[in-house]
Every structure is written in C-alpha cells, then in structure tokens.
Amino acid sequence: MAAPMVRKSYSGVVATVPVSIPYERYSIESAHWWIGRALRALAQGAGISHREIDGFAMASFSTAPDSAIGLTQHLGLSPRWLDHIPMGGVSGILSLRRAARAVQAGDADIVACVAGDTNQVDTFRRTLENFSRFAQDAAY
C-alpha cells in the first residue's frame, strides 16, 4: 500500500489586492471590457504596471470565442504562466490555488486572477444554448 500523499502548504505565497468592480445587472460592454477594468484596478491597487504581471488566470463564460490566450494580447500582457478556468462559481478558488502553485514552482512571480462576465439582453439564452448538452436537453 502506498503511503498517503502529504500536501505541500502554501507558505511563501501571498494573495493580495482584492478588487471588485460594482455589479451592473445589464451592460452593453463585453466581458473583455469588464476583465480589463478589473485588471487595471488590480495593477493600480498593487502599484505596478500591468506589464509586470507574468501570470494570468481568467474565468469567464462569456468571452467566447476568445480564451485567456486571446485576452492576453488584447490587454497587453506577456505571461509566462496562463490558465483559463470556465467552471463558474468555483473558479475563484481554483484560480488562487493554481496561481499559488505556479508561484511556488517558479513559473510566475505575480499572477492576476480575474473573472468577468456580462449580461446583455440575450446573454442568458445564448449561454444556455451552448453551455452543455445537459443544459440543452433540460431547456429544449
């Protein structure tokens, strides 16, 4: 029988500069815009340039067809470490855990973990249409 695995602690990793952009029920802006706004607030709060961010974790359901890699170019980032986590409410926790491990491994020094979506007039219906086969079966 194998010995139980002992998880490594998160010592030496710091989570700082939490940012929250005020909620708007409906918006004509894209999720990309909201994520960019959050990233700007994060960089300002940390007192750094966005160019110093060398890790980027993004969570969103409404940036399609773009993913985190496309957004890095749009936002002027050049990360050494990149993650796209489209898993809904648990994405924030996953982003922080993965980012912490990336810092511990030396893959990045400063990781921005951002999430953003938008709710335009038809967003909910379009999201359900393409969310999953299970959602399609339940809705149609």
Question: Language-model segments: which ranges?
Answer:
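Conserved "HGTGT" condensation-loop signature of ketosynthase/thiolase-family condensing enzymes
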Residues: 1-87, 101-105, 112-140
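Active-site histidine-anchored catalytic micro-motif
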Residues: 94
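Short helix-initiation/N-cap motifs at beta->coil->alpha
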Residues: 89-91
